[in-house]
């Protein structure tokens, strides 16, 4: 990446990559590969040095510091060449060893480049200063960049993970490890920041956020401050050290947008809560609270702002310079707000934190003479108990005297001070840990959104390997975790290496380096390993650390190589055993391991926590079960509670979960390194860094790299860089493939040829070989440079010598000139010349000056003009520049808009494809959903049956209540009789009072009477006491009666509530069903099918609505019954008060009477016993009803869970199908690419054919030139023979051409047959797949039948169970009716009933077991069905692929048909040529006949000549020789004549043979043409049939849509009737629905318009195809014309005929052109019409969008109204709570008054009756007030329920409206897509029309040129004719 490219990174560029200048300087640095080395050093680990000498296996070297050292040769390690200085990926180092890695990191760190790659790792060094490499500019620069395209950075790792997730559709993980202070937390924050920026959900998240909460991105980012406050602390190395590990999963949607997040935590250092080292401090939250930023918090927690007041937090430092605790506290508090914590939750967290502070200050002392602790002051205990919601005395008692279970009894145990202190520390740690885990769970709940999520990226921030002087249990857990992670890395790394080798085709034996660490892992985690032995020892009560050590030694010492006995060194902590880890040997001290692993708590205090009034604390310990947790009845073994699980077991469980998560992801590794322990920026401590490199696996990774081929270079780069080693191997100017060149080059070098391998694209090197090649290259370069220097020096010296020679020559010339001048200077003429010469020059200079002045004036004027012109131009230029900039901005904006539009278009096309695929999937899933629908209806029927059973139970209860009321009336009658008897007694009491008064008057008269009266008073007091007891008993019996009544009412309310719950669940199921129906309707609407099923669903919906009405009516009836019950209860209460009042009056009378009847007491006791029996029976009945209701609820929950699992399974199937779809897409792309290659190859062959035809035409033209020599026939008769030979050769060529054409035809037919055969095979394969699919479906049906049988069996079992329950109910009713009459039989029946109940419970358990087995079989069958469905999907996909192949073969057939037509046209042209040849033959025949006539004339002339010769022979005997020669000529001519005759006969025979061939070809052509026409007709019929079918489907869909709208309107009307209370809101919603219906109508109209436009487009496309065919015909005819024109040059007559034909064809083409023009104009008109339609569609779409927005606004208003109603509901709840509080106060006052009443009764003994009556009146008033308050409370509860129901209905309605709006939006988007597609098609049609016009113009132009050439040829032929005539005439004259 060049410097200009690095400019994108802004100010961070210098901190990320070296500049080009630095790289050049580094490469030119002097370097000697043999001498420059690393040597070991005690302080610095390794130092750079130069070798001085080598002797006897030892090396002497001089270090950089000038120090001379001698070391062994195997300790010396070579340095890397300067090319590798500050390399970004250390795996590319040619010498890959520890010092090379160390110095590369050190040099990069010195340049502040803190990120470096090491193979798969990214190593980061903590800079201890701020660097500008995390800003928004850097984030933008890394976005979308590959790893190789950008410098190393945590953003690059994050972006690669994000891109891999989107492209590979696989979960990713980023593993960030390192020591404390290395920067893990900061890098984790940066990763989260990067994802929050690039994958933000944007506006949607802002709309969705609730008031007070942030967006999802804010919440993810703000989770860190909250967790850091409670999980981070200051350590020696780091001011903000994370004392826990975390795995943050960030979930994304299918498009890569943020969906949700969750956090898992590991190994929180809870010991820090109570203990810190001197240089460290506790968790930040304690000091943040003490910072006094929120004073009200200090008051609430009862603490001061001085940390030293609290023992737990003042053991180390209390302030940190780099942290502002007050600001951090505000950040923590605001983070809680953003994360949605309620004020109650925040206060609970702060209270528990404050309680831990006070825990540390609790003091205890030893009791005298006892080993027993007691509190030393209770102030701190009171504070902590108050904050925790506990009783202080109970807390102290639990700490000092805990209860311990011994056998089956609990015993109080004494604790000493040390044990109490340990218990306090353990409780504080446990509270803090559980609170931290609760916070993580609460944050996860906030980050869990309801948005769909597809993939996640996990970020693991966990402590690295630890080797300290004192290593304990915590270090073992951390090191074990890192051992597992390192094994995971090793395995993953070499799996990737192997994949690379496999991809490159390199032979490689796989070595699983993950197994190297298996021995150590097994030693720790396997059975009888360290962890299992530790857990085993924890179970034994007498086990100690030493017994644990002994067991370890017995099992592992000497048996495992990784387990060793340590060597203890003085001054260091004692170690008990050593483990050999991958990072080194670690000595472990086992003191306190058993205690740490068990981590016991004071269970008495934990029990107090569980009962705490602080809700958070009780929730934290709600699931805690100690060591004595009870055994589960259903299982054989005891199972401890989750809270008592050992630390090691819990850690292993969490670690296994983490490893499972990581294995399911694609990992990325980041290793953080701390450079020094002083936190100094830029300083690197070499031993510390080397220790970390060993610990974090970087050197382990390098070790693995060295086993393979760590260095690899692309062939092109290798050839370019190392060609210099042997240029002869790759010659210049000769093209050689890069791989072959690299093979030749490496083969020619003197190196070990086993050290490299050749891949497909790269050459791979073992470690060190590349350095050797670099050394050879440097040597070669030095030799070349030396040679260049020598040559350049020679050239320079030669140039210098040449200059010296030139100087010498010039000196000689100057000397000669001076000598000549000295010889002539004294001549008189010369002197005269010297005088005149200056004068001449002065005159000339004056003229020149004058001219120059004039010129200066002109130039000055011109300059002024040019200046003015320049200014004008500059002004113009400025304005033009401004315009240019404006235009550029406009162009840029247009380009951006265009790019955005293209992106949107591409995205929409992709979405369309995905939606089409989803539509296909949904059609296949439709049947499954219908089956699920049927199952739901069956379950609904079952629930209805259960509801009816519950109603029957309620009726039974009501009957029992009626019986109880009757009995009560009977008792009331008895009470009335008693009152009548009491009235008689009252009269007696009146008489007695009179006598008493008389006695009192005579009191003074007689002391004896007084004594008697005193005795009477004593007896009366005794009677009063007895009567009071009786009254108390009666009141107790009344209270019990009241309680029974209350219990019955409570049971009734509970049953009514359960009934409501079941009804609500039914309503929810019905709502879910309606949603499923709507989805089905939507899918039917999209798929254009299944109209009948939709009507069924609508009928079912109407039935459900009827049922809903019935249920609502039933609810109203129940509410009325409840009201009646309440009124009856009020009457009973009133009656009770009257009775109590009457009883009190009776008691007063009895008191005075002093008598009591034992009979009444016995009757009261009997009644009381009967009431108690009835109460017990009713309680049993209510318990059983509650059990049945709970069972029903459980069944309902199970059914809901099953539905959820089925939905999850369907989603998984969907994901699998999408994956297979993408794979098939890839296969299809491969096939299409192969087809394109075949088409290209075919085009190349056609080009070759054309070139051959051109060559043939050239040969023809040459042949024609040879034919011109025919004109010399008149002069030489011998040329006839050559002309005949030329003609025969042409005939042979034509024969060859015809045979070639026939061969091509045969090959084409053969290929056509092959294609047909392939098509038949594909059809057979498709049929086979269809058969397999049918068989799979058959198997699926069988499995479904089996499943149905199982469900029927389950239903039968449930029926048996219900029967048993009914029998139980019958026995119970029987027992209740006969209870009063037969007590003995009742007891026996009770025993039998108990036995029957036990049997029934056993039967229920058996049934449940069978149900669970049936559920398992059901799940198994479901899985098999899913597998079968997957097979079906695959077979469907294969069938679809076969269909695609068939379509491709159809296309190929069409292409072959076109080729056949072309061959047919060529055949026609060959026929024409044959005809022309026949005409030429005819001409030749004529010429031959003429030649015969000439021959006869020649014979005659010959005879005449012979006669003359004979005459001459007689005269001249000497002329014999000439006669003999003439005779020879004659013989030759005769032979030539014979040859010509034979040639002519052969030509005639060949012509006849060719004519026969042509006839046969014509017949075959006619047959094939007829067959093709027949097939085309069949195809047209099929197309028409399909079109008709589609139209029928569209009509059916239209009808279904109308039915749907009608049913929707009907449903809306029903809703209007049901929602009478919300008329205004319903009006708005119905208006929105009407708008939606109008939008649907508009959509229909748009669809019809789109169909019309589609038809028009199809017509246009067809017209366009016709145009193309016409143009192809014109082009072919043009070729024919050219061929005929070339033939015209040879034969003039043929030229004239062809010209006539051309004129005819020209007329035809002109007519066709006119047709084309007309078609083009019609196309343009259609385009205009389509544009108008498109604009209309766009306006309509915009209107629909506007209507959607209006509907959205109305929905928002509805939501605000719902929120207002929710507020009203909250107010109602507050008022009800207030009334409840008032009720409690009233009850308290009643109790007080009762107490006062008792006191008043005692006072009444002394004569205070009036006061008692007043108090009773007051009590009655208070009871009336209480009844009124209870009525009001009941009314408010009723109103609250109504409002809750109304809110639910409103939310449901708003949800429905939102779904409608979403559907409308989808429709609008689809319409816009179609509109764009039609636009694009129209534009393409216009472009094609324009191209056709241009082609037509081109053809017309070529035709004109052809005509011109024909005219020229005709003129040339005429000239040749004239010439031939002249030559013939001349020849005749000469003869």
UniProtKB/Swiss-Prot annotation:
The modification N6,N6,N6-trimethyllysine is found at residue 129. GO terms for biological process: adult heart development; ATP metabolic process; cardiac muscle contraction; cardiac muscle hypertrophy in response to stress; cellular response to 3,3',5-triiodo-L-thyronine; cellular response to angiotensin; cellular response to hydrogen peroxide; muscle contraction. InterPro entries: Kinesin_motor_dom_sf (IPR036961), Myosin_head_motor_dom-like (IPR001609), Myosin_N (IPR004009), Myosin_S1_N (IPR008989), Myosin_tail (IPR002928), P-loop_NTPase (IPR027417), XRCC4-like_C (IPR014751). Residues 781-810 form the IQ domain. The modification Phosphotyrosine is found at residue 1308. The modification Phosphothreonine is found at residues 378, 1282, 1309, 1513. CDD domains: MYSc_class_II. Residues 1915-1935 are annotated as: Disordered. Myosins are actin-based motor molecules with ATPase activity essential for muscle contraction. Forms regular bipolar thick filaments that, together with actin thin filaments, constitute the fundamental contractile unit of skeletal and cardiac muscle. The rodlike tail sequence is highly repetitive, showing cycles of a 28-residue repeat pattern composed of 4 heptapeptides, characteristic for alpha-helical coiled coils. Four skip residues (Skip1: Thr-1188, Skip2: Glu-1385, Skip3: Glu-1582 and Skip4: Gly-1807) introduce discontinuities in the coiled-coil heptad repeats. Limited proteolysis of myosin heavy chain produces 1 light meromyosin (LMM) and 1 heavy meromyosin (HMM). HMM can be further cleaved into 2 globular subfragments (S1) and 1 rod-shaped subfragment (S2). This is Myosin-7. It comes from Rattus norvegicus. The lineage of its organism: Eukaryota, Metazoa, Chordata, Craniata, Vertebrata. The gene is Myh7.
């Amino acid at each position: 990446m060049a410097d200009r490219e690095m400019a994108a990174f802004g100010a961070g560029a210098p901190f990320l990559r070296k500049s080009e200048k630095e790289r050049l300087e580094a490469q030119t640095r002097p370097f000697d590969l043999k001498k420059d080395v690393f040597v070991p050093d005690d302080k610095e680990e390794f130092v750079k040095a130069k070798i001085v000498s080598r002797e006897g296996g030892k090396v002497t070297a001089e270090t950089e510091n000038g120090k001379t050292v001698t070391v062994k040769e195997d300790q010396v390690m070579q340095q890397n060449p300067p090319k590798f200085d500050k390399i970004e990926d250390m795996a590319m180092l040619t010498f890959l060893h520890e010092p090379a890695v160390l110095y590369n990191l050190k040099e990069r760190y010195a340049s502040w480049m803190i990120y470096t790659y090491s193979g798969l790792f990214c190593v980061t060094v903590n800079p201890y200063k701020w660097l500008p490499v995390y800003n928004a500019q850097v984030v933008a620069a890394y976005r979308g960049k590959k790893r190789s395209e950008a410098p190393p950075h945590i953003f690059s790792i994050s972006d690669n993970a994000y891109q891999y997730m989107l492209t590979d559709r696989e979960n990713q993980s980023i593993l960030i490890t390192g020591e404390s202070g290395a920067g893990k937390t900061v890098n984790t924050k940066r990763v989260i920041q990067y994802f929050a920026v690039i994958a933000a959900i944007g506006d949607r998240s802002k709309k969705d956020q609730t008031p007070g909460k942030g967006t999802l991105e804010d919440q993810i980012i703000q989770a860190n401050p909250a967790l850091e406050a409670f999980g981070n602390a200051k350590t020696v190395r780091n001011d903000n050290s994370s004392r826990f590990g975390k795995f943050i999963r960030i979930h994304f949607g299918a498009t890569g947008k943020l969906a949700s997040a969750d956090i898992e935590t590991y190994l929180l250092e809870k010991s820090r809560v109570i203990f810190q080292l001197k240089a460290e401090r506790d968790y930040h939250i304690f000091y943040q609270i003490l910072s006094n930023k929120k004073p009200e918090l200090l008051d609430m927690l009862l603490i001061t702002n001085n940390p030293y007041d609290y023992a737990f937090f003042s053991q180390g430092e209390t302030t940190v310079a780099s942290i502002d605790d007050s600001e951090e506290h505000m950040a923590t508090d605001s983070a809680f707000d953003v994360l949605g914590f309620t004020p109650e939750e925040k206060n609970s967290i702060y209270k528990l934190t404050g309680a831990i502070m006070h825990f540390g200050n609790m003091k205890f002392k030893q009791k005298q003479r006892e080993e027993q602790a007691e509190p030393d002051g209770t102030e701190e205990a009171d504070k902590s108990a108050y904050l925790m919601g506990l009783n202080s005395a109970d807390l102290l008692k639990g700490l000092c005297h805990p209860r311990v279970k011994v056998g089956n009894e609990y015993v109080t145990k004494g604790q000493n001070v040390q044990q109490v202190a340990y218990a306090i520390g353990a409780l504080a740690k446990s509270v803090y840990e559980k609170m931290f885990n609760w916070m993580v769970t609460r944050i996860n709940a906030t980050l869990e959104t309801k948005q769909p999520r597809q993939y996640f990226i996990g970020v693991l921030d966990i402590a690295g390997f630890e080797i300290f002087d004192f290593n304990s249990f915590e270090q073992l857990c951390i090191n074990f975790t890192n051992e597992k992670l390192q094994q995971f890395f090793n395995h993953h790394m070499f799996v990737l290496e192997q994949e690379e080798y496999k991809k490159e085709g390199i032979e490689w034996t796989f070595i699983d380096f993950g197994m190297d660490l298996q021995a150590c892992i097994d030693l720790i985690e396997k059975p009888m390993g360290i962890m299992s032995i530790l857990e085993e020892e924890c179970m034994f009560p007498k086990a100690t650390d030493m017994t644990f050590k002994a067991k370890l030694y017995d099992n592992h010492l000497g048996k495992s190589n990784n387990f060793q006995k340590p060597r203890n060194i003085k001054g260091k902590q004692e170690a008990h055993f050593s483990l050999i880890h991958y990072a080194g040997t670690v000595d472990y001290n086992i003191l306190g391991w058993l205690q740490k692993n068990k981590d016991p708590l004071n269970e008495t205090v934990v029990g107090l926590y569980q009962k705490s009034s602080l809700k958070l604390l009780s929730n934290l310990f709600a699931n805690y079960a100690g060591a004595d947790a009870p055994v589960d009845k259903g299982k054989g073994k005891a199972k401890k509670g989750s809270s008592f699980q050992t630390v090691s077991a819990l850690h292993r469980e969490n670690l296994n979960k983490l490893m499972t998560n990581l294995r399911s992801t694609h990992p990325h590794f980041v290793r953080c390194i701390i450079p020094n322990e002083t936190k100094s920026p830029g300083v690197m401590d070499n031993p510390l860094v080397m220790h970390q490199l060993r610990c974090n696996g970087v050197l382990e990774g390098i070790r693995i790299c060295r086993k393979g081929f760590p260095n690899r270079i692309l062939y092109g780069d290798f050839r370019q860089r190392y060609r210099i080693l042997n240029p002869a191997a790759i010659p210049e100017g000769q093209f050689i493939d890069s791989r072959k060149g690299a093979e030749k080059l490496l083969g020619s070098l003197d190196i070990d040829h086993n050290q490299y391998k050749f891949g497909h694209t790269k050459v791979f090197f073992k470690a060190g070989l590349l350095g050797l090649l670099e050394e050879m290259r440097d040597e070669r370069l030095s030799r070349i440079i030396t040679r260049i220097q020598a040559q350049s020096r020679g050239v320079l010296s030669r140039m210098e010598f040449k200059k010296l020679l030139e100087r010498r020559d010039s000196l000689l010339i100057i000397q000669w000139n001076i000598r000549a001048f000295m010889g002539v200077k004294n001549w008189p003429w010369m002197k005269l010349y010297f005088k005149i010469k200056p004068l001449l020059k002065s005159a000339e200079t004056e003229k020149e000056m004058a001219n120059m002045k004039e010129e200066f004036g002109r130039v000055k004027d011109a300059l002024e003009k040019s200046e003015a012109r320049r200014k004008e131009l500059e002004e113009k230029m400025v304005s033009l520049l401004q315009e240019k900039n404006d235009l550029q901005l406009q162009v840029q904006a247009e380009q951006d808009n265009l790019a955005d539009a293209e992106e949107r278009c591409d995205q929409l096309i992709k979405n369309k494809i995905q939606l089409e695929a989803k539509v296909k999937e949904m059609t296949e899933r439709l049947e499954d959903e219908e089956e699920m629908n049927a199952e739901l209806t069956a379950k609904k029927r079952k629930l209805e049956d259960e509801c009816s059973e519950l109603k029957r139970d309620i009726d039974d209860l009501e009957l029992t209540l009626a019986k109880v009321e009757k009995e009560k009336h009977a008792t009331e009658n008895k009470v009335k009789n008693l009152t009548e008897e009491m009235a008689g007694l009252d009269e007696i009491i009146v008489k007695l009072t009179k006598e008493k008064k008389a006695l009192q008057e005579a009191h003074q008269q007689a002391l004896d009477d007084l004594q008697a009266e005193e005795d009477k008073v004593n007896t009366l007091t005794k009677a009063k006491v007895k009567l009071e007891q009786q009254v108390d008993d009666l009141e107790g019996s009344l209270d019990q009666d009241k309680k029974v009544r209350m219990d019955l009412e409570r049971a009734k309310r509970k049953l009514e509530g359960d009934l409501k719950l079941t009804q609500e669940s039914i309503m929810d199921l019905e709502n879910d069903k309606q949603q499923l129906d709507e989805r089905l309707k939507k899918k039917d609407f999209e798929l254009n099918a299944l109209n009948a099923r939709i009507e069924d669903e609508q009928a079912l919906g109407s039935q459900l609505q009827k049922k809903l009405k019935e249920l609502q009516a039933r609810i109203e009836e129940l509410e009325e019954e409840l009201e009646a019950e309440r009124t009856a209860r009020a009457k009973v209460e009133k009656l009770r008060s009257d009775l109590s009042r009457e009883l009190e009056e009776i008691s007063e009378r009895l008191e005075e009477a002093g008598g009591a009847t034992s009979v009444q007491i016995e009757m009261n006791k009997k009644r009381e016993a009967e009431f108690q029996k009835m109460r017990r029976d009713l309680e049993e009945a209510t318990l059983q009803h509650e059990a049945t209701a709970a069972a029903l609820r459980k069944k309902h929950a199970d059914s809901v869970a099953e539905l959820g699992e089925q939905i999850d399974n369907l989603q998984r199937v969907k994901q699998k199908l999408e994956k297979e779809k993408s794979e098939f897409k890839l296969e299809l792309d491969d096939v299409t690419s192969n087809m394109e290659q075949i088409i290209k190859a075919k085009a190349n062959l056609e080009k070759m054919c054309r070139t051959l035809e051109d060559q043939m035409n050239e040969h023809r033209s040459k042949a024609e030139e040879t034919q011109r020599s025919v004109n010399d026939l008149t002069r030489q008769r011998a040329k006839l023979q050559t002309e005949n030979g030329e003609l025969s050769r042409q005939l042979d060529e034509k024969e060859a051409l015809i045979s070639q054409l026939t061969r091509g035809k045969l090959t084409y037919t053969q290929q056509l047959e092959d294609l047909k055969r392939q098509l038949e095979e594909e059809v057979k394969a498709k049929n086979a797949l269809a058969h397999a699919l049918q068989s799979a479906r058959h198997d699926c049906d069988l499995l479904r039948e089996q499943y149905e049988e199982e469900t029927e069996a389950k239903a039968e079992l449930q029926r048996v169970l219900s029967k048993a329950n009914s029998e139980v109910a019958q026995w119970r009713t029987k027992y209740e009716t006969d209870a009063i009459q037969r007590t003995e039989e009742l007891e026996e029946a009770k025993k039998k009933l108990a036995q029957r109940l036990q049997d029934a419970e056993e039967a229920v358990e058996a049934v449940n077991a069978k149900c669970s087995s049936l559920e398992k079989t059901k799940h198994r069958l479901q899985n098999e069905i899913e597998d079968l469905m997957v097979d079906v999907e695959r077979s469907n996909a294969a069938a679809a692929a076969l269909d695609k192949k068939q379509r491709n073969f159809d296309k190929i057939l069409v292409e072959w048909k076109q080729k056949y037509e072309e061959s047919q046209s060529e055949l026609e042209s060959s026929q024409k040529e044959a005809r022309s040849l026949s005409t030429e033959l005819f001409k030749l025949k004529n010429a031959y006949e003429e030649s015969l006539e000439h021959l006869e004339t020649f014979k005659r002339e010959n005879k005449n000549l012979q006669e003359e010769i004979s005459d001459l022979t007689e005269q001249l005997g000497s002329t014999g020789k000439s006669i003999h020669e003439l005779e020879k000529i004659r013989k030759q001519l005769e032979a030539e004549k014979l040859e010509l005759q034979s040639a002519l006969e052969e030509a005639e025979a060949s012509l006849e043979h060719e004519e026969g061939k042509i006839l046969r070809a014509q017949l075959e052509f006619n047959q094939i043409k007829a067959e093709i026409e027949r097939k085309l007709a069949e195809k047209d019929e099929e197309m028409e049939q399909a079109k008709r079918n589609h139209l029928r489907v569209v009509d059916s869909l239209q009808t279904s849509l109308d039915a749907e709208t009608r049913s929707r309107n009907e449903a809306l009307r029903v809703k209007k009737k049901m929602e009478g209370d919300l008329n205004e809101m319903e009006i708005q919603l119905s208006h929105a629905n009407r708008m939606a219906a109008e939008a649907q109508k508009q959509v229909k109209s748009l669809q019809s318009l789109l169909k019309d436009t589609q038809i028009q487009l199809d017509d246009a496309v067809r017209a366009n195809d016709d145009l193309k065919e016409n143009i192809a015909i014109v082009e072919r005819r043009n070729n024919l014309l050219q061929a005929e024109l070339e033939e015209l040059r040879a034969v003039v007559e043929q030229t004239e005929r062809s010209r006539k034909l051309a004129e005819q064809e020209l007329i035809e083409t002109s007519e066709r052109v006119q047709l084309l023009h007309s078609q083009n104009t019609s196309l343009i008109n259609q385009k205009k019409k389509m544009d108008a339609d498109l604009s209309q569609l766009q306006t309509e779409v915009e209107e629909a969008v506007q209507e959607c927005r209006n509907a959205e606004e109305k929905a928002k208003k509805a939501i605000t109204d719902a929120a207002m109603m929710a507020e009203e509901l909250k107010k109602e709840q507050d008022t009800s709570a207030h009334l409840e509080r008032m009720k409690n106060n009233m009850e308290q006052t009643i109790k007080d008054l009762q107490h006062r009443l008792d006191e008043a009764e005692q006072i009444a003994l002394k004569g205070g009756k009036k006061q008692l009556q007043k108090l009773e009146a007051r009590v009655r008033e208070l009871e009336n007030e209480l009844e009124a308050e209870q009525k009001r409370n009941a009314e408010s509860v009723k109103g609250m329920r109504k409002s809750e129901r109304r809110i639910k209905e409103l939310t449901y309605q708003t949800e429905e409206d939102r779904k409608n709006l979403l559907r409308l939006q989808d429709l609008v988007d689809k319409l816009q897509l179609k509109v764009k597609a039609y636009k694009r098609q129209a534009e393409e049609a216009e472009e094609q029309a324009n191209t056709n016009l241009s082609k037509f113009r081109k053809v017309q132009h070529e035709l004109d040129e052809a005509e011109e050439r024909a005219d020229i040829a005709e003129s040339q032929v005429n000239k040749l004719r004239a010439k031939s005539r002249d030559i013939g005439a001349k020849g005749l004259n000469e003869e």
